Amino acid sequence: MNIIQQLEKEQFDKLSATKTIPEFGPGDTVIVNVKVVEGERTRVQAYEGVCIGRSGGGLNESFTVRKISYGEGVERVFPVMSPMIDSIKVVRRGKVRRAKLYYLRKLRGKSARIVEKKTDRAAATN
């Protein structure tokens, strides 16, 4: 293990102790609360959309969230360990068979919907 990997691992461990990141993947609908700086004030802005992919690993990991705003598709890439991310919440799990959902960029309307993943009721009650 070289020095850079060792430093990244130390930073990742330090940030992981303070931040709780839920398990989510492509197809999941997430709400990302982002800290926005406006002049001297900072506020938290919620960004809700479908996670269309995750890339990287460790300290350099990021994920892309896509939403439709006023009929226009908007994508935003968030670093997982960014200090600008206040929290991440998973709203619903999606049933997909791909790691990258870039094909959603071409789809409109009902065809762009993702089926919700069914959870096993027996496992949920125990």
UniProtKB/Swiss-Prot annotation:
**Organism field:** Nitrobacter winogradskyi (strain ATCC 25391 / DSM 10237 / CIP 104748 / NCIMB 11846 / Nb-255)
What GO molecular functions are on record for this protein?
A: structural constituent of ribosome
Function comment: This protein is located at the 30S-50S ribosomal subunit interface and may play a role in the structure and function of the aminoacyl-tRNA binding site.
Transferase keyword on record: no
User: Which gene is the coding source of this polypeptide chain?
Assistant: rplS
Q: Which GO terms describe its cellular component?
A: cytosolic large ribosomal subunit
Q: Which family does it belong to?
A: Belongs to the bacterial ribosomal protein bL19 family.
Q: So which domain of life are we looking at?
A: Bacteria
The UniProt keyword set, sorted, is: Ribonucleoprotein, Ribosomal protein
* Protein's UniProt name: Large ribosomal subunit protein bL19
GO terms classed as biological process:
translation
